[in-house]
UniProtKB/Swiss-Prot annotation:
The keyword Cytoplasm applies. Its EC number is 2.8.1.10. This is Thiazole synthase. It catalyses: [ThiS sulfur-carrier protein]-C-terminal-Gly-aminoethanethioate + 2-iminoacetate + 1-deoxy-D-xylulose 5-phosphate = [ThiS sulfur-carrier protein]-C-terminal Gly-Gly + 2-[(2R,5Z)-2-carboxy-4-methylthiazol-5(2H)-ylidene]ethyl phosphate + 2 H2O + H(+). Pfam families: ThiG. The active site is at K105 (schiff-base intermediate with dxp). The gene is thiG. Pathway: Cofactor biosynthesis; thiamine diphosphate biosynthesis.
Length: 262
């Protein structure tokens, strides 16, 4: 598929339309300059920002917005590091006051060892945030039942973890992801657990609308090159999904016709 055709393959969340299907984070880089270079190399249009960990408002210290420009990227504030619904809601209200952001990513973690989501707290916080005027993309477990509950509660997007945050273990439960994608009427994005380019490709081949990653790029030996690799991986996976893979067969089938042989 040529570039002109691919450019029309967009996705939409909360009324906002994007061409890039790769979302990148803003943590773990050696500095904001490297972070900005990686975001550019990834071809990203959205960057997710941990409100509690990134300087957005103190001009006396290095600021993310001096390097990753809000007029170039859509900022997606998140609640990384929050373990209660109240903490997450307070964090996102501060983000809205600081930058006017109402499209946000909710994550309410259950413990510090695996950083998997507390789904009861997540669902409760989601309902309160929606009532407060936020458009919420939700980090969640790969449980199709809870994913549907989040969608029915008004989530703008469902973001199941492929594996624990920062683990780099890749997609651990492709079946559950496929079930979530099949039933969803809102975008589904793999969030957390991607380790290398093939993981991103698999996520897109399953039918995900996009992939979010941070550590896989930031902790690579060459983050900028890995960002480029992830960009191509996401495109390849999406193209393969749209093309439709060949069926799997039990037995061989010759690739050349048998008729007309000497």
């Amino acid at each position: 598929m040529d570039g002109s055709v691919r450019s029309e393959d967009t996705w939409t969340v909360a009324g906002r339309t994007f061409r890039s299907r790769l979302i990148v984070g803003t943590g773990k880089y050696k500095d904001y300059a490297q972070n900005a270079a990686a975001a550019e190399a990834a071809g990203a249009e959205i960057v997710t920002v941990a409100v509690r960990r990134v300087n957005l408002s103190d001009p006396s210290q290095p600021m993310l917005v001096d390097h990753v420009k809000p007029d170039r990227f859509t900022f997606l504030p998140n609640t990384a590091g929050c373990f209660t619904g109240e903490d997450a809601i307070r964090t996102l209200r501060l983000a809205r006051e600081a930058g006017g952001w109402d499209l946000v990513k909710l994550e309410v973690l259950s413990n510090t060892k695996h950083l998997l989501p507390d789904m009861e707290e997540t669902l409760r916080a989601l309902k309160l945030l929606i009532a407060d005027g936020f458009q919420v993309m939700v980090y969640c477990s790969d449980d199709p039942v809870y994913a549907k509950k989040l969608e029915e509660a008004g989530a703008a997007a469902i973001m199941p973890a492929a594996a624990p945050i920062g683990s780099g273990r890749g997609i651990q439960n492709a079946l559950n992801l496929a079930l979530i994608i099949e039933q969803a009427k809102v975008p589904v994005l793999v969030d957390a657990g991607v380790g290398t380019a093939s993981d991103a490709t698999i996520a897109m081949e399953l039918g995900c609308d996009a992939v979010l990653m941070n550590t896989a790029i930031a902790e690579a030996k060459d983050p900028i090159r890995m960002a480029r690799a992830m960009r191509h991986a996401v495109i390849a996976g999406r193209e393969a999904y749209l093309a439709g893979r060949m069926p799997k067969r039990m037995y061989a089938e010759p690739s050349s016709p048998l008729s007309g042989l000497i």
